[in-house]
Swiss-Prot record:
The gene is ppp1r7. Residues 1-46 are annotated as: Disordered. InterPro entries: Cilia_flagella_integrity, Leu-rich_rpt, Leu-rich_rpt_4, Leu-rich_rpt_typical-subtyp, LRR_dom_sf, U2A'_phosphoprotein32A_C. PROSITE patterns: LRR. Regulatory subunit of protein phosphatase 1. It comes from Xenopus tropicalis (Western clawed frog). GO terms for cellular component: nucleus. Residues 1-13 have a biased composition (Acidic residues). Belongs to the SDS22 family. Residues 14-37 have a biased composition (Basic and acidic residues). It is found in: Nucleus. LRR repeats lie at residues 63-84, 85-106, 107-128, 129-150, 151-172, 173-194, 195-216, 217-238, 239-260, 261-282, 283-304. Residues 317-346 form the LRRCT domain. This is Protein phosphatase 1 regulatory subunit 7. Keywords: Leucine-rich repeat, Nucleus, Repeat.
């Protein structure tokens, strides 16, 4: 009887290409629009009027806690002093050039200025309760003006023109920092961020993993689409669970000896020839290794120490030329339920 008759029938169902929580390809955080905009009337969304909106024509509710003026043609921050209880202020996708006139909004905990024309961070000194600040997609060149925000927990500075990591000394409660799509070359000045949980540095010009020693609480690190050639400097990150290093120039898998808690390892689109030095990663669930130079089937033995491995990406490696590509992966890694973009059902 042929071997095929005794093997379990495999059904395949196409699924979407993998998506990282980090969304490091664009590192741009998406948020749903808030239902309660805190606006009574006078709303004029962007595109419905030829001239910029005069904020004085918008009747703000003084009792509103959540105010959403997303996608208006607001050119200047003004008239918000009537908001006595506001906690969340969303001014996304406007024409704002200057952070100003927010001094009286001392109850504010979240300020969203994503996608404006702001060139400098400033005038935030009185917003001491601020926990979330989004200045992504602006024209910032420096990180500054944050000294008074000691309660800040999440800071988004994606897609600006920032060339240096600096001035984080007082942000000791920061848990999430997004600096993707900037002009950074060096990882530095993060020593004080001991509570940091997630760090996103994708799409910069970083050449070395360094100066991460004090970030022992870090669970997510993304340095995708940079200029790395070596995995190093991660020995103190013992709580790291997700590591994204795709689209670099890495040649060898190494330097992960102390990262035993990794559940996701993304090394796609590098120059790696061997799967090695990861047999100790027993908690690994997702391993992305597509678009590399792996050609030896025996390398899959390195993944045998992860009984919970669910997803592997190995497409566009020399291995894929084998006619039995998928079957060999399933035999070597019986726990896997997704190979590349296809689910496997036994």
């Amino acid at each position: 009887m042929a071997d095929e008759e005794g093997e379990t029938e495999v059904q395949e169902m196409e699924v979407d290409r993998r998506e990282s929580d980090e969304s490091a390809d664009d590192e741009a955080k998406e948020k749903p629009d808030r239902v309660d905009g805190g606006v009574k009337n006078g709303e004029v969304p962007l595109g419905e009027a030829d001239a910029p909106v005069d904020i004085e024509t918008i009747n703000l509710d003084p009792e509103a806690e959540d105010v959403d003026l997303n996608h208006f043609k607001i050119g200047k921050i003004q008239g918000f002093e009537v908001l006595k209880k506001v906690k969340t202020l969303c001014l996304r996708q406007n024409l704002i050039k200057l952070i100003e006139n927010l001094e009286q909004l001392v109850t504010l905990t979240e300020l969203d200025l994503y996608d404006n024309q702001i060139r400098k961070i400033g005038n935030l000194e009185t917003l001491r309760d601020l926990q979330i600040l989004d200045l992504s997609f602006n024209l910032l060149r420096r990180i500054e003006g944050l000294e008074s925000l000691s309660h800040l927990q999440r800071l988004y500075l994606v897609n600006n023109k920032i060339s240096r990591i600096e001035n984080f000394g007082t942000l000791t409660q920061l848990r999430l920092l997004e600096l993707g799509s900037n002009r950074l070359r060096v990882i530095e000045n993060l020593d004080s961020l001991r509570e940091l949980d997630s760090l996103f540095l994708g799409k910069n010009k970083i050449t070395k993993l360094q100066n991460l020693e004090t970030l022992t609480n870090l669970t997510v690190l993304s340095v995708q689409s940079n200029r790395l050639t070596k995995i190093e400097g991660l020995q103190n990150l013992v709580n790291l669970r997700e590591l994204y290093l795709s689209d670099n120039g890495i040649q060898v898998i190494e330097g992960l000896e102390n990262n035993n808690k990794l559940t996701t390892l993304d090394l796609a689109s590098n120059r790696i020839k061997r799967i090695e030095n990861i047999k100790h990663l027993s908690e690994l669930q997702e391993f992305w290794m597509n678009d590399n130079l792996v050609e030896n089937w025996s390398d899959l033995e390195e993944l045998s120490g992860a009984p919970g491995l669910q997803t592997v990406y190995l497409e566009r490696n020399p291995l894929q030329k084998d006619a039995q590509y998928r079957r060999k992966i399933m035999l070597a890694l019986p726990s896997v339920r997704q190979i590349d973009a296809t689910f496997v059902r036994f």
